Amino acid sequence: MSQFKEKVFAACAKKEALFDESLGRYALRSMLAGAYLTMSTAVGIIGADVIATGIPALSRFVFAFIFAIGLVFVLIFNGELATSNMMFLTSGAYYGKIKWSKMCTILLYCTFFNFVGALILAWFFNQSFSFQHLTDKSFLVTAVSTKLGKTDWMNFTEGITANMFVNIAILGYMLLKE
């Protein structure tokens, strides 16, 4: 059996067991994963704005670099992130290690609580001093404007590409953990 299959099967068993054992703990881990990524997104936005005053060309890199730290938090603190669950659980369902209906239930539950965790932390950041002073030149405003200016197809393909990078990073972490 390949190392990938071993990791997928182990991850599926662990996620399914946690989900069956305690929905509350699973929800909390999912909320924390959403919060970790919101935290790194917020810090990345401020970092991008700060660096843009001196070296504007680096602002997108700074944001991406700081955002990646949120993924590290998810991995280190065992958060339940919908993106990685899509990889593990879908692969597990494909290989028959988890039922398709159970996979969909866990994914919906995880995605919902990722969103709840992100919303709660985003609300707190919205109340902070740093986010009260965003202007139309701010990284956040220009990033959202750029995203809204793209076609649906471009956003779809960029989303898939971003998820591929996240899953490669998570799989790499899992394989290096041995």
Segments (PLM) and residue ranges:
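Alpha-helical transmembrane segments and their helix-helix packing motifs
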Residues: 1-178
